[in-house]
């Protein structure tokens, strides 16, 4: 198949879907749109980007607004109990016309999918296709040769493209294919994330809250859109780099919730339903380059493959 550009990334594909002269292909390994979980915080300036698609006000109407943050620490009288110690405005005045908001990543992606379907190109995502490898040939109108695997049938196909943009995350296969190397280290610190419906007497359950206990760790509490659901980021402590998989197996949904309940003492947390759960470790790494042209080749040719996104 010949596809002038091919993209792995929804924001960029949505932008290009407005141009009938540009043929774009959006490839996603999952078998369908994201339903729950993953990222949920949207900075003011990101909302401005969605407004460029005409979606900013729709997003703001649906989302939870983060107007302030409260802080809880161990009580000086009884360090087994927490108490509120501070309250601050979440974003400074004049930063943006839009607020800092919280909304499910699946909703954001659905906004963009709907935008693409209604665009001049009527662009649709291709689900169930996994990136395998690519190579850039020296000549030809479509020099980037990409191999894709159909997840359902395990069959492979080849796509020729003028350009490829890989927006496939921290473990980017596109980045690996062009030989770019991430610099930095995984911070050996883990967090459990739980989206839940719960009954609680904690007074700030509908405010963004940073909660520190004396001995049980820390929680970042994020209210979710809709008025009922809440997300807890629960501090799970340090990880032995050689025991990452065992660490994940040890920290189950139940154990993470139990940790959160201990952090919140003297308040109670009765979890009624868990919508999503994950354990992840914090890391900050940056790739040494963002395209397929090494520094020593920059005067010889223009790039054909790019990596972008988070």
Which role does the model predict for each range below?
Residues 127-144:
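A conserved short coil-to-beta-strand element within the FAD-binding core of flavoproteins
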Residues 25, 274, 305-308:
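Residue-level marker for buried hydrophobic side chains located in beta-strands
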Residues 35-122, 126-128, 213, 222-224:
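Active-site-adjacent segment of FAD-dependent monooxygenases/related oxidoreductases
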Residues 21, 61-74, 79-86, 93-94, ...:
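FAD-dinucleotide binding site
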Residues 27, 167, 194, 308-310:
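Active-site flanking residues adjacent to catalytic metal/cofactor-binding acidic residues
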Residues 114, 163-286, 294, 300-303:
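Conserved FAD-binding catalytic core of PHBH/FMO-like flavoproteins
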Residues 1-8, 25:
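Beta1/beta-strand and adjacent pyrophosphate-binding region of the FAD-binding site
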Residues 12-40:
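Glycine-rich FAD pyrophosphate-binding loop
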């Amino acid at each position: 198949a010949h596809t002038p550009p091919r993209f792995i990334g929804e924001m960029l594909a949505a932008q290009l879907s407005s141009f009938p002269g540009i043929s774009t292909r959006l490839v996603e390994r999952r078998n369908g749109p994201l339903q729950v979980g993953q990222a949920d915080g949207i900075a003011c300036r990101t909302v401005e980007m969605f407004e460029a698609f005409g979606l900013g006000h729709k997003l703001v109407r649906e989302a939870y607004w983060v107007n302030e943050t409260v802080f809880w620490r161990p009580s000086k009288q009884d360090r087994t109990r927490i108490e509120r110690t501070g309250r601050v405005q979440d974003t400074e005045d004049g930063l943006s016309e839009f607020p800092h908001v919280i909304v499910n990543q699946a909703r954001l992606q659905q906004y963009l999918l709907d935008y693409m379907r209604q665009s001049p190109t009527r662009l649709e995502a291709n689900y169930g296709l996994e990136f395998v490898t690519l190579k850039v040939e020296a000549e030809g109108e479509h020099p980037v040769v990409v191999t894709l695997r159909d997840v359902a049938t395990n069959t492979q196909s080849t796509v020729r493209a003028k350009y490829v943009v890989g927006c496939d995350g921290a473990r980017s296969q596109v980045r690996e294919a062009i030989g770019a190397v991430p610099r930095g280290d995984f911070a050996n610190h883990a967090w459990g994330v739980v989206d839940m419906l719960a009954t609680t007497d904690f007074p700030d359950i509908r405010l963004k809250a940073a909660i520190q206990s004396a001995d049980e760790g820390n929680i970042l509490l994020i209210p979710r859109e809709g008025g009922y659901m809440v997300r807890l980021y629960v501090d799970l402590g340090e990880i032995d780099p050689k025991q990452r998989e065992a660490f994940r197996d040890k920290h189950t949904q139940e154990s993470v919730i139990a940790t959160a309940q201990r952090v919140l003492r003297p308040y109670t947390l009765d979890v009624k339903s868990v919508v999503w759960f994950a354990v992840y470790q914090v890391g900050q790494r940056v790739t040494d380059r963002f395209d397929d042209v090494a520094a020593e080749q920059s005067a010889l040719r223009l790039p054909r493959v790019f990596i972008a996104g988070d």
